[in-house]
């Protein structure tokens, strides 16, 4: 919901006569809408069946841990901490930025997504690899909602770098880079195999690729 509006705004400036509607939902709903031709595209980090759908890479996404500052676990981890600004600037992509050992947060309360969500699956795996099962106090359906709930300082949450850059900054958060394959994923645009791609669809995909080019 936070990724598409800027792209749609640019697209509408160029093609004002093309009608665009955005639908937000979980993977099950979105795949169903794509299957019955209710939508032309889906943007998702979940892997859809390649025999039914084609895909085009939108971006690489990294999962961070956002922790309210008041938790004592932060006190000895200053060398790992990232600010909202450093995530905006993508400083964490430098090889000198260390990933925090996740086991330091084994006693924290967590706000996570509901079971079955890709972010939840990855969060569970990261915690398991760190040797603990997270103490979950709240389960929600959207990353943005979990992030806003965590901003009340109830607990830590897993959040993608792409969303951190789109959502408001909260001074009482510190962010931590995470290690492991589960902390990195690809985000794709999906569309049905053998479906005719209109010029509008082609132009929209082209604009998403241009928008996501790295800055010089």
For each of these PLM feature ranges, what is it?
Residues 1-15, 19-32, 199:
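N-terminal winged-helix
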Residues 6-10, 28-84, 174-176:
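Short beta-strand-centered segments that line the small-molecule binding cleft or hinge
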Residues 12, 54-57, 79, 94, ...:
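Short secondary-structure boundary/capping segments
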Residues 15-21, 133-137, 186-188:
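Residues at or immediately flanking beta-strands
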Residues 26, 30, 35, 45, ...:
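Hydrophobic hinge/microswitch elements
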Residues 46-47, 69-70, 160-163, 187:
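Short secondary-structure boundary segments
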Residues 73-75, 80-130, 197-198:
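Secondary-structure junction motif
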Residues 163, 172-216:
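A late-sequence structural motif
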């Amino acid at each position: 919901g936070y990724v598409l509006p800027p792209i749609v705004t640019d697209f509408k400036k160029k093609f004002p006569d093309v009608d665009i509607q955005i639908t937000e939902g979980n993977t099950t709903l979105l795949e169903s809408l794509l299957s019955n031709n209710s939508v032309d595209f889906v943007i998702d980090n979940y892997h859809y069946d390649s025999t039914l759908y084609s895909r085009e890479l939108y971006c690489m996404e990294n999962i961070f841990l956002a922790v309210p500052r008041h938790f004592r676990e932060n006190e000895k981890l200053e060398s790992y901490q990232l600010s909202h600004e450093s995530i905006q600037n993508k400083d964490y992509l430098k090889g000198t930025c260390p990933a925090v050992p996740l086991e330091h947060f084994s006693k924290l309360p967590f706000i996570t997504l509901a079971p079955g969500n890709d972010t939840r699956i990855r969060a569970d795996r990261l915690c398991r690899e760190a040797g603990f099962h997270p103490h979950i106090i709240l389960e929600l359906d959207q990353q943005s909602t979990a992030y806003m709930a965590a901003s009340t300082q109830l607990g830590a949450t897993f959040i993608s770098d792409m969303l951190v850059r789109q959502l408001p900054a909260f001074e009482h958060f510190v962010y931590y880079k995470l290690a492991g394959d589960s902390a990195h994923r690809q985000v794709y645009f999906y569309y049905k195999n053998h479906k005719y791609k209109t010029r509008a669809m082609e132009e929209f995909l082209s604009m998403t690729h241009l928008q996501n080019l790295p800055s010089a």
